[in-house]
């Protein structure tokens, strides 16, 4: 039987993680290594300034105390497997990870860490609005992720080394689901948002709020943003090399000025 290392960034008690573990357990031996608390927005951050400790929850189920998702992958591979697993899956995230959000996502950061370790990796996220997640749950996301994992096991991982797959599920019920499409990451426009306050000792603090994010749907019709809003699930190949190759020649000319 194949072996899967499963993690997330919503914490070891998150419903998306537990339901996906149950679903993937039908085709693989699933070992869970998840953060003890929510670590959204942690990207591929690793904890380098203090020791970390695995706490066993159940058979093949561990939480890593106050760790990041990337920590869970890194130490999960080091401590929980004698040989590398066949696949690393991160999710199901409670919320989409699309466009530039991918760069700060803890869910995608875990998949990136897996890819850098040379292991096929898949990030899975469920888009939701309002109470749609409570109403629809993770059944559709589990089904689609299951099919993608089966395809990986049957046909091999379709990407080059150090690349991973980013799967996003639309906020629709099964009867309104339009299918799975390959899509590039879209583009958003970001602004800051934070609440100011004074702590009991009279010191000023800031509490980061939900980022003000906007996008032009006309420019994103065939991206993960547009297709997700139309009821499609999207599968996007992601690589860690963020070099803007098309700018290199222009930058060399600029440097000579």
UniProtKB/Swiss-Prot annotation:
Annotated cofactor note: Binds 1 divalent metal cation per subunit.
Keywords: Cytoplasm, Hydrolase, Metal-binding, Nucleotide-binding
Primary location: cytoplasm
Function: Nucleotidase that shows phosphatase activity on nucleoside 5'-monophosphates.
Similarity annotation: Belongs to the SurE nucleotidase family.
EC number: 3.1.3.5
GO cellular component, one term: cytoplasm
Any single Pfam family the record assigns to this protein: SurE
GO molecular function annotations of the record: 3'-nucleotidase activity; 5'-nucleotidase activity; exopolyphosphatase activity; metal ion binding; nucleotide binding
List of residues binding a divalent metal cation: 9-10, 40, 93
Names of the cofactor(s): a divalent metal cation
Protein name, per record: 5'-nucleotidase SurE
Enzymatic reactions: a ribonucleoside 5'-phosphate + H2O = a ribonucleoside + phosphate
Compartment(s) of residence: Cytoplasm
């Amino acid at each position: 039987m194949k072996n899967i290392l499963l993690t997330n960034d919503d914490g070891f008690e998150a419903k998306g993680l537990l339901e996906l573990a149950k679903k993937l357990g039908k085709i693989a031996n699933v070992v869970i290594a998840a953060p003890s608390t929510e670590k959204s927005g942690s990207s591929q951050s690793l904890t380098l300034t203090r020791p970390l400790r695995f706490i066993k929850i159940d058979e093949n189920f561990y939480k890593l105390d106050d760790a990041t998702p990337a920590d869970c992958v890194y130490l999960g591979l080091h401590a929980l497997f004698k040989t590398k697993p066949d696949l690393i899956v991160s999710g199901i995230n409670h919320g989409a990870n699309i466009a530039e959000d991918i760069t700060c996502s803890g869910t995608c950061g875990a998949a990136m860490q897996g890819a850098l370790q040379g292991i096929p990796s898949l990030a899975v996220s469920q888009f939701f609005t309002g109470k749609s997640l409570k109403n629809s749950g993770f059944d559709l996301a589990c089904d689609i992720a299951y099919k993608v994992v089966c395809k990986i096991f049957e046909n091999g991982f379709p990407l080059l080394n150090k690349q991973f797959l980013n799967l996003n599920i639309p906020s629709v019920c099964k009867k309104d689901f339009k299918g799975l499409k390959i899509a590039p990451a879209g583009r958003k426009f970001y602004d800051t948002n934070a609440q100011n306050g004074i702590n009991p000792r009279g010191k000023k603090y800031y509490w980061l709020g939900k980022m003000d994010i906007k996008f032009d749907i006309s420019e994103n019709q065939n991206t993960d943003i547009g297709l997700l809003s139309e009821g499609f699930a999207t599968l996007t190949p992601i690589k860690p090399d963020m070099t803007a190759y098309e700018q290199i020649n222009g930058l060399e000319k600029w440097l000579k000025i």
